[in-house]
Amino acid sequence: NSSPKDVVTFTETGVRDVTWDSSNINAQLGETMTMKDCWFAAYIKSANEVCAQIAEYVGGTEANFVEMMNQKAKKLGCTHTHFVNASGLPDENHYSCAEDLAKIMRAGLKNARFRKVLETVSYTIPATNLSAARPLHTHVPLLAKESSLYYEGCIGGKTGFSTEAQNCLAVVAERNGRTYIAVTMRDTNLGINCADSTALFDYAFNSFDSIEVDGKAMTVPKGVTAADLTMESKQKGKKTLNQYYYQGQFVGYVTVKDTPAPEPVQEAEETLAAEESEEESTPVTAQTDKA
């Protein structure tokens, strides 16, 4: 819905969120910056005014964009999520849960631009028409190598804080081709979020492995092989859905396109008919042994 080179001009929609108690980059009315710079401001700095301005630019109004957010969340299978603003500022009707945030993060990882922004530790927004350059550095300790909480394999994450929600963190780690998402919420400080996330990642990497089943990777407990899985097949139109389970727990699926039976060739049909006709017209001679 936008290009990195698009130029965004800050309006009242954005600058209204520039307050002392709201995370921001102090954007000014009439200030311009590229959409790419806006992405990094929203991600690294959690700049609420930038989130609102992106929403207005893409959706025409922030309200329209929020409706797009809700529709997307529903499409992703989120069942306990509802947005009323683009930034996540507190509202009793603005909520989500750990499972839904993990689904949203998983969807984001499939987008190359999202992933590139997610992996960024430091970024500098160049000087604009109304501001000097703004250097930004990640607020995710698990991503920052200089942090004592750095986690090997962490590729990025998103922090969040409000008095009502306390500290929340959705973070991603990859090792040996396996990717895990950890979401922790309502911790009293970010250090606890990081410790909980580290414990979750350690458990996942130490307890599970990836195996190949019918050409597709599936995550199973270490030591489990494809032979240990059970399969259930379901017909979906012209495709067969093979669902695999380990001790009743779903581990993955493979979609197989059904191959239609080949249609008989007319020439072969004519040949077969001729042969059958010849057999029917050929007399059978009984042979009697002579004494």
Feature names for model-found ranges:
Residues 1-99, 103-112:
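Active-site-adjacent loops and short helices of periplasmic peptidoglycan-processing enzymes
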